[in-house]
Swiss-Prot record:
Protein's organism: Streptococcus mutans serotype c (strain ATCC 700610 / UA159)
Protein name: Phosphate import ATP-binding protein PstB 2
ABC transporter domain: residues covered: 21-262
Stored Gene3D superfamilies: P-loop containing nucleotide triphosphate hydrolases (3.40.50.300)
One biological process term in Gene Ontology: phosphate ion transmembrane transport
Complex formation: The complex is composed of two ATP-binding proteins (PstB), two transmembrane proteins (PstC and PstA) and a solute-binding protein (PstS).
Gene encoding the protein: pstB2
Binding, ATP: G53, P54, S55, G56, C57, G58, K59, S60
Length: 267
């Protein structure tokens, strides 16, 4: 078994003006257990960043902290800063509902609402009291087009979202997330429940979406990280170990642990 120097780090940084989001000394605790250990990390605007690492390394916990999803866990405590447009979204006075309009989330398994395709997209607007039908129609069409789903469902908008295939449901969830025009889209293993064809379609959708959005994705699929992302971060036991351009991580990693992990020789 290879012995690694876990004190080694290689983490790139970016100029402030091209940052979409950053964390400073971010810790996450579940009770007494420290799941994330003081991570400083920056995300570049309109790029796809993949978070990789063994099961239990903290990558999903880290992702969920970026828009306060860990708030729903009673024993979770998050300290440090999460900076979006100069504002610490981890501060106690932040309106979490409003913040999540800027930092959206797509979950591991498709979770459409028990409503029509149309009402899945308009849900947030109708909840806010918006009744302008033309406005809502335009939002539905634009969002579904951006999620590469419009052509498949444009004649069935008032059918139940549950009539869609798994891949279509996941793209509907993406459309629902981008309908409120977020700046950042968080994706927690969005292809894990999809077949290979639906996965490829999802990756193509992500590539188109990065023209308008910053995407941060957790994946266990090394091929997906290599294909779909611009930057990749390797996590291990709650620490950020290496963070660089995806080509560098997969072809010329600075650290042996990273190189072994992405090539399947880790351990």
């Amino acid at each position: 078994m290879t012995e690694y120097n876990w004190n080694e780090r290689h983490i790139i940084t970016f100029p402030e003006e091209i940052l979409a989001l950053s964390t400073k000394d971010l810790h996450v605790y579940y009770g007494e257990k420290e799941a994330i250990k003081g991570i400083d990390m920056q995300f570049k605007k309109k790029k796809i960043t993949a978070l990789i690492g063994p099961s239990g390394c903290g990558k999903s916990t880290f992702l969920r902290s970026l828009n306060r999803m860990n708030d729903t866990i009673d024993i979770a405590k998050v300290t440090g800063q999460i900076l979006f447009e100069g504002i610490d979204v981890n501060a106690a006075n932040i309106n979490v509902y409003e913040m999540r309009k800027h930092i959206g989330m797509v979950f591991q398994r498709p979770n459409p609402f028990a409503k029509s395709i149309y009402k899945n997209i308009t849900f947030a607007y109708e909840r806010a009291g918006v009744k302008d039908k033309q406005f809502l129609d335009d939002i539905v069409e634009t969002s579904l087009k951006q999620a590469a789903l419009w052509e498949q469902v444009k004649d069935d908008l008032h059918k139940s979202a549950f009539t869609l295939s798994g891949g279509q449901q996941q793209r509907l969830c993406i459309a629902r997330a981008i309908a409120v025009k977020p700046d950042i889209l968080l994706m927690d293993e969005p292809a894990s429940a999809l077949d290979p064809i639906a996965t490829m379609q999802l990756e193509e959708t992500m590539s188109e979406l990065k023209e308008n959005y910053t995407i941060i994705i957790v994946t266990h699929n090394m091929q997906q990280a290599a294909r779909a992302s611009d930057y990749t971060a390797f996590f291990y036991l709650g620490d950020l170990i290496e963070y660089d351009k995806t080509n560098n991580i997969f072809q010329n990693a600075k650290l042996q642990s990273t190189s072994d992990y992405v090539s399947g020789h880790f351990g």
